[in-house]
A protein has these predicted regions:
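A generic structural motif
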Residues: 31-40, 92-98
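Solvent-exposed beta-strand/loop surfaces of large extracellular or lumenal domains
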Residues: 21-33
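Flexible glycine-/small-residue-rich
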Residues: 2, 52, 96-98, 151, ...
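Active/ligand-binding-proximal structured segments within catalytic/core domains
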Residues: 4-19, 43-94
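Terminal appendage regions of diverse proteins
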Residues: 171, 177-246
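Extended active-site and interfacial segments that coordinate phosphate-rich ligands
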Residues: 11-21, 172-175, 205
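Functional cores that coordinate and move charged inorganic groups
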Residues: 56, 79-182
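Ordered, soluble secondary-structure elements with a strong preference for glycine-centered loop motifs
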Residues: 7-11, 60-65, 102-106, 159, ...
Length: 246
């Protein structure tokens, strides 16, 4: 009759964890019911104790709050509207309705991380219909039910039903890892918090292997790859000339 598990919605996956000894693999909303998808049966009518996979939940909170920071700043700095959001296992995808230059993306990322270090409060409330009518807030949908408003002080006011951190410092950091033009606007890939650390660790492992293979220092890995490409092109041209001479 009640649960602490967040169901899939708004671009965010459902919570995982346990109900007693049974693993919860996913949580979804069906009508007015919250459905827990488990790896084993539970006896109907019995009371169970739920335990969230907190590390996973918190990582998603970091990413979702980080997305609000970026979307709020993109709106205030460049007049962008967030028209798409999807939280994957390793990255978050954001779609904006306007194109942004690499320089603008750098400013956006820098401003977002500055705001995170300021440890601004993140609050959620359910305004009355009268309060909501007078409120300027972001929303990707036409909302007809009770609206939950998540506010990041001095940055963003948005309708959102998902769990969030209590202050921006808990996000840790946000990093834009890729961008492409998309439907007249831009699609961004971002990581935040624990996912940002995991992303950095993977890339550090890769760059260490590449630099070792090329016998260069890590900051010179790109130059080492370019040198290798030029050497390969020279060898191809030499081979072509040799074959023509035979």
């Amino acid at each position: 009759d009640r649960t602490a598990f967040y169901p899939e919605g708004g671009g965010q996956p459902g919570d995982q964890g346990t109900l007693d000894t049974v693993r919860v693999l996913d949580t979804r909303e069906r009508g007015d019911a919250i459905v827990h998808i488990t790896d084993g049966p539970l006896t109907p009518g019995t009371s169970v104790t739920g335990e969230l996979d907190w590390a996973l939940r918190f990582a998603r909170m970091q990413c979702h709050s980080g997305e609000h920071v970026l979307s709020g700043l993109a709106h205030s700095l460049y007049g962008c509207t967030n028209v798409g959001f999807h939280m994957g296992e390793d990255q978050v995808i954001l779609d904006f309705d306007k194109e942004l230059t690499p320089q603008q993306l750098t400013v956006l990322e820098d401003r977002a991380n500055q705001l995170i270090t300021e440890n601004r409060p993140v609050t959620a409330r359910y305004p009355t219909p009268e309060e909501l009518a007078a409120l300027d807030y972001r929303s990707k949908l036409d909302l007809t039910e009770q609206v939950r408003i998540v506010t990041i002080a001095g940055c963003d006011v948005c309708a959102c039903c998902a769990p969030h951190v209590t202050c921006t410092g808990e996000i840790g950091l946000v990093k834009l890892v890729d961008a492409m033009r998309h439907r007249g606007g831009i699609r961004l890939w971002m990581v935040a918090g624990r996912l940002a650390l995991a992303d950095y660790q993977r890339k550090q492992t890769n760059i260490a292997a590449i630099s070792a293979a090329l016998s260069v220092q890590q900051p010179q890995a790109a130059q080492g790859v370019e040198r290798l490409k030029q050497e390969l092109q020279t060898l191809k041209e030499t081979l072509k000339q040799t074959r023509q001479a035979l």
